[in-house]
């Protein structure tokens, strides 16, 4: 559960309705893989990830980024039940993929940066603070199975 004020919840959902999940998702996952290159080990089947340009133009990175943001959209629709919303994904990432849960926090922070880049002055410090709460809640929900 994310503790947002009514104004924060309205602001994050209003902005989220404007997000192009394909563009933002691809950029967020691509940036994660470039900025934190050790995360690339989970994406061996994605082909060429040898340079930042290769990562950012990789069709599989873009497609998976869209998939990630579609799941995040489900969370945005269920901010009061993030653990339930992400229970199956938490189990998958813990038991089968063995993803370090710290990577969820890293991706959340990258997503906030990408949102700031895409929305400029619309992405006020107050909105950033609210989104930091959301991505922290999503990261905690995804890490829940690890506890």
UniProtKB/Swiss-Prot annotation:
The entry's cellular-component GO terms read: blood microparticle; haptoglobin-hemoglobin complex; hemoglobin complex
Biological process according to GO: hydrogen peroxide catabolic process
Quaternary structure and partners: Heterotetramer of two delta chains and two alpha chains.
Its family? Belongs to the globin family.
Q: What is this protein called?
A: Hemoglobin subunit delta
Q: What GO annotations for molecular function exist for this entry?
A: haptoglobin binding; heme binding; hemoglobin alpha binding; metal ion binding; organic acid binding; oxygen binding; oxygen carrier activity; peroxidase activity
Positions annotated to bind heme b: 64, 93
Alphabetically ordered keywords of this record = Heme, Iron, Metal-binding, Oxygen transport, Transport
**Which CDD domains does the entry link to?**
Hb-beta-like
Source organism per entry reads Carlito syrichta
InterPro entries this protein is in?
Globin, Globin-like_sf, Globin/Proto, Hemoglobin_b, Hemoglobin_oxygen_transport
